[in-house]
Amino acid sequence: MRKLFTWQAAGLLLMPLLFLSQSISAQPKPVTPPTNGTGTTPTTNGGGSTKPGPKPYKEVITEKAQSRSGLLTVHKVEDKWYFEIGDSLLGRDFLVVNRIAKAPVDLQSGFIGYAGDEIGENVIRFEKGPNNKIFIRTISYSVYAKDSTKPMYKSVMRSSVQPISAAFDIKAFSKDSTGSVIDFTDYINSDNDILFFEGFFKPFLRIGSLQSDKSYILDVKSYPMNTEIKTVKTYSKSSGPTVPGTFFIPPSGNATFELNSSIILLPKNLMHSRYYDDRVAYFTTEFTDFDADPQGVKDISLITRWRLEIKPEDTAKFKRGELVEPIKPIVYYIDPTTPKKWVPYLIQGVNDWQKAFEKAGFKNAIMAKEAPTKEEDSTWSLEDARYSAIVYKPSTVANASGPHVHDPRTGEILESHINWYHNVMRLLRDWYLIQASPSDPAARKAQFDDELMGQLIRLVSSHEVGHTLGLPHNMGASASVPVEKLRDKAWVETNGHTPSIMDYARFNYVAQPEDKISRDGLLMRIGDYDYWSIEWGYKPVLDKTEEQEKAILNEWTKEKVKNPRLRFLHYDGVDPRAQTECLGDNNMKANEYGLKNLKWIIPQLPDWLNEKGENFDNLADVYNEVVGQYNRYMFHAVTYVGGIYTDYKTTEQPGNVYTVVPKALQKEALNFLSKNLFETPYWLLNKNILDKISTPQMDRINSIQDNVMGSLLSTTRLGRMTAEYNRDNVNAYRIDEFVDDLKKSVWSELVTKKPTDAYRRFVQKSFVERMISLINPSNNASGTGGISIVISFGPTVDNKKTDIISVAKGTLRSLLTDIRAAIPATSDKLTRYHLQDVADRIDKTLNPK
């Protein structure tokens, strides 16, 4: 069961770019084959005679040849590169993985363009064609029919012809006639998306056509299961947009890359697959199966996981419940360029998963090692697709990501290159300082000591490794923890503040200084849910087919999900339990504690970040992070309004899948916003800080106020609330009641007769402009003078056919009456002008001329 949603929002930090290497394109782009050198297109000689056929082996692979045996035997003859393809490999599936080995300067675009980045992935087959040809076909597994004895199999095959992406003349046959020799030189030298950049990447990197005269083959090496091609490629480069905050425009010209292409033989013995379950969740490989449903088609999702198999001699031990070592453990190598002081922490972050795999019955199933030196292993290469690695990248990107490469036929994870960007440490410093410094004195300074930073690196390492094991984010894990337990020193230090390291619940910001909670209760760790998810995904179910084990896994899952700590919640922007950067089972209560800590931190920042001889950039950076944290707290509350709980179930499980968030919680969220946002947060406007980091401006607070108002009054949210009330008029929050409560909060001065400050007047105008925009959608409701971001999840709504415009007009009529009644008694001139202005705007909307 899948829930579809749309969203409009800025990207969230540390949200890895997982999807770049999660799936093989179902519609690969065609490659234009070379037209010379390899004889890849038939040619004629004047009188129409065709090119000569294969020559004797020794005439092609001469005594000058430098030969390398392996998966594909490679021969270099002068400036030609010949591939010798055994007949036994024809028709076999190969996975081609392309990476940047060395990147040009000043070309990176966000997360893309660094050494180690994957830039392409394809499944191909070599096959023998007519007229002494070898073809490369690009293979898609988007449709599937397993049983070749059924008529449906033939029908699917007729409608699923795989494209021929390249063709080569057979230059010679192997000495023993069991293989074919082709000239691969021109194909490597060409620009094609089988071996190099997929078209998707080029616009991001601003690169265009290949500069052939500035490109060449560096080397080709072959190993038992893979062949590695290393090239230098130069592309034309267009100038880029101005770099934000500067006058610098990246220049045009050329960009030169060192690229590596790995051609890997996929297993003939397919891994035992496991079907996806929404209640646990893994990354998936998907296809349409025409055999699974006799009365239709069925979309199949298989989880992606490593092939961990029991040694035959250990099967009896496993059945007795003893831990066994897998045939092939999961090994990650640490990039040799990684600063030495961080290597132990990165290794520990990997090894921390060993306990989780013990739940699946395996010991020593996963480990990290330092990459071997040239003296230890001259064949080891970071770009070699046989090896998984944590790749250290000299980047300003404050992030890390954990993609993986998998076999699209079964979901078997083959390798992973975790991207570790150097500047992630700045982000860790900022977040730990603003979330944990009230409890950890070591966080109250500009530069953390190595032990603290190392522990932060360790937890991010574990998080990214989790992605490479197949685990997505479990944003709802922390919602299983009662808020007050986050302040219980003994409990939280034992259990952690979230049961999953795959949650975005960085640090325990609920803990107060007086709680005296140590780092054991502040830092994320691999928790109960992670142990369960690894058990579910990796524990072998012996002597069962994929279909048969589904019933067994279902019984496991039904029992386990009775424990809220073992629950997976999908992030959909509508379920308030599954949000990023939040803690506890009630975000309003948790975030009140978080705000209390921010109020404690703010006045101390100038002292903590006082660096002799330095300017105030560090202070500005951390202050802006405080504002960002405050913004997160506000939007956590917003999600409760019109929120829907989603709990995926199978048909035999009791309870509903979709449940409206109780009205009492929605009202609590609105009260939280009224108190902490719509009433001016003067504590955040610390003059001692602001006078040092910026000219006077109101945008920091105003933009949050306006964006929250826009999200609360979005047609998507109001439309969803209308539908919720129609389904459940007991628990739902009716939109007229909600809008009236919001109006009373924002316009309370009409009753109290108190004067308004500039921030409060802004909020009131924002409310009115948002209401006007519901009536007249063309009205620009942004009141900040800049970009107004409205985050909304769900289907679009036609205002004219719902109660939304009716409620908006009714609210403005009532408000206009109240404003006109208040004007005569208003003594403050600015407040009076403000009320007169707003009254005019409402009147113009309700009574257009």
Q: What residue ranges belong to the model's regions?
A:
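Bacterial N-terminal signal peptides that target proteins for export
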Residues: 1-12
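Bacterial N-terminal signal peptides
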Residues: 10-21
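Signal peptide processing junction and immediate N-terminal pro/mature segment
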Residues: 20-30
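Auxiliary tRNA-acceptor-end handling modules of aminoacyl-tRNA synthetases
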Residues: 28-338, 356, 360, 371-426, ...
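Zn2+-dependent metallopeptidase catalytic core
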Residues: 90, 341-365
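Second-shell loop/turn segments in exported
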Residues: 332-343, 446-452, 488, 616
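The catalytic-center signature of Zn2+-dependent metalloproteases
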Residues: 370-393, 455-512
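Conserved catalytic/binding loops enriched for acidic/polar residues
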Residues: 478-849
